[in-house]
Amino acid sequence: MKIAIALLACLGLAAAASFHQTHEVKIADKAFLMKQKFLFEIVYRVEDPLMFEDHIKQGEKFYFEESYYTHYDMYMKKFFEAYKAHALLPKGEFFGALVMSHAKQARGLFNFFYYAKDWETFAANVAWARMHVNEGMFVYALTMAVIHRNDFHGLMLPSIYEIFPQFFFNSKFVFEAEKFDYEMWMKMTMYEKEYMDVYYKTNGYDYSTMYRSSDYTYMKDFKTWQWWKLMGLGEHWYTEDKFILRENIYEFNQETKWLSMMKDVKKFYMPVDYTRDLNLYNKESKLSYFTEDLGWNAYWYYLNMDYSFFLDGNTFDLKNDRRGEWWLYNVHQLLSRYYMERLSHGFGEIPEFSWYQQIEMGYDPQLIYYNGIGYSFRKNYYEMETYANYDMLDKITGFLKRIHNIVEMGYYKTADGHTIDLRKPEAIEFIGNMLQGNVDAMDKMFYQFWYMLAHMYFADADYYQMDVYPNVMLNFETMMRDPMYYMFYKSIAQVYFQFMHYLPKYTKEQLLMPGVTMKNVEVSDLTTYFDLVDFDVTNMLNDKMIFQDGKFVWDMSLFARQMRLNHKPFTYTYTIESEKVEKVVIRAFLGPKFDEFGKVISLAENRMNFMEIDEFYYELKAGTNKITRKSSEFYWTVKDRTTYTELYYYTMMAFDGKYDFPLDISEPHCGFPDRLVLPMGWQKGMPMQMFFMVVPYVAPAHEQFSTFDYTYSCGIGSGARYVDSLPFGYPFDRAIDEYEFFVPNMYFKDVSIYHADTMEPYYKYKSYSNYGHFDYTFFNDYYTKYFKF
């Protein structure tokens, strides 16, 4: 179970304990638990009719009257009018957050949730919307309301991949999950056992020789990532009678309350992989384990919930967080991370995007919407121009030309005659707002809708179309699966680099920290591997829900058991000499050393490929400072989140007075997966480089974590999320003069990333004696603090 110290590490506070006071764990009271219980139940099987009688009664009325709200605007009025005219997006239809007609209705619904004066009004509206509003729109609006309401700190929803597993797993798996029936499963298991007993006794085999080297069934369609075949398992449901696979499960499976809580839950898992398993569509399919990773996609989803394009900076205080710069910097960082993963497979630069040339890499997401309609796919060498909406294309390309032109000119004159200087570093905020197409853009007439139109164009959705075919590019939680996403967003990042090109390069005097020298940095071994994890997909169950004395009995859970990239914990130790006591910030970056041809990339070019992995405050003493930093302490990363099943059980136990529910029981929604910090690397070692820099502490307007509780909140809009006020990515944010760049308070370190094949023991004939059963003897050690290769 998470405790405050664990989150301190995840948020990069451990090394700054002298600067930020420690924080005691807060325990939820009865009122909080009532609200948390409501939120968990209201999204349970969200595509099915609501079955909780208490919530059905709560939702008998929707409060449309202005007196129930702190603010009442045009979008709320339009939503109400659409409801009266039966013009809302129907339940069961595909919802796209980047479909213009859908987004306008979602904004109205969000406002009804966000501006509700009290919990009673909010809960009534949510319960009503759960029964009457499109499921996708409902979850989208509810997620943003829970994140942004100031009186909801600590409240949470299940992860988006637990609410809608259909958006993250292939249609074959979804079909098996939705038709799962416990009684039928029991019968099939019994029949299979009887059949196998007869078969092997008749043929004189025993279970230790269930396959031979001549068995075609063992070798056919074999792929090295198919761990279930290596263990002799099929793609169907198995009972999970030991423990849920998760990297931090050792925190739970030794706790008596957790064991007692979970013993009555029937747990089942089914092996599932990525699109590469069903079809190697093109070479990009090799990267599907990364681009379709649940944590990778969820990070982008929550970033765009935190800083949604229709939330204005003044009302929601997003301007305090440098929302435009932060969004654009995240685009850059995600592209850098993706590029490093490409290098692990010998792929080169992310291809350039063109509106008028073929898109070489097609994509088939193999997803199915919960209404049964499959997602559209794109063929290899697809020509978008052939199927274009030319009016929409003109608007999109016109925007891009306009923004490139104003960056080159160095200023912009708005429609009301105001001139903005684009040669100042802080102008990156305006550029970021324009590129995101958010409501804080300088001229809403020109810049607000281009981003949405671009995604609609990719999905062949018209301006006012309501009935839209499912497409991954229309929702934040699915778009990063598509290789075209990275091509298109590379063109967005190029505007960022174009803007930075016109800013003056940092001089040696600006980069130098007098009296401080970084003498050495020792980095431990960097090793990646593929582990297995269970994702909670219980929301896809279709069996009858059981209630006893009015209480819901959660007696069964389904899990998707999936292979995913991870890394061993690593550390680095700084040796820094200082002439006096100094308040500093230490930054760490990871970047490539060579391109796909083995050629060294110059620093002037390579700066765009570095990804910042750590940043923390420290007080140097006079003399030599030895500072050890663990990978678990990185400021923006999180471990595996507690599953939906466990969170609901913890809530109910606490509600009944049998458990103290800590508000930091799960990880903050905004964190980047710790396990994806390192690219896969090579078995022989992939050469990379790390960059470290110590800079003077430049205090932000609000001291980090001073205005929100960092143990369970992301502090969106607080202005206190960042350790200092330097530009994001400093000193790689601007072009580099290599004659001026290198100073004593910097340090470059050549490193190698090794990849260990954890499945190798199963490749050999008869190397696994328990063939036909999951190997808990190996994974029991695998999921402990002491796991070693």
From Swiss-Prot:
Gene Ontology BP term (one): energy homeostasis
GO molecular function: nutrient reservoir activity
Pfam family, one: Hemocyanin_C
Top-rank taxon, per record: Eukaryota
Tissue specificity remark: Larval hemolymph.
Main location: secreted
Subcellular compartments: Secreted, Extracellular space
Keyword list, A-Z: Secreted, Signal, Storage protein
Keyword Secreted included in the entry's annotation: yes
Signal peptide start and end residues: 1-16
InterPro entries assigned: Di-copper_centre_dom_sf, Hemocyanin/hexamerin, Hemocyanin/hexamerin_mid_dom, Hemocyanin_C, Hemocyanin_C_sf, Hemocyanin_N, Hemocyanin_N_sf, Ig_E-set
GO cellular component: extracellular space; larval serum protein complex
Entry's family note: Belongs to the hemocyanin family.
Complexes and interactors: Heterohexamer, composed of three subunits, alpha, beta and gamma.
Function of the molecule: Larval storage protein (LSP) which may serve as a store of amino acids for synthesis of adult proteins.
Protein name: Larval serum protein 1 beta chain
Biological source species: Drosophila melanogaster
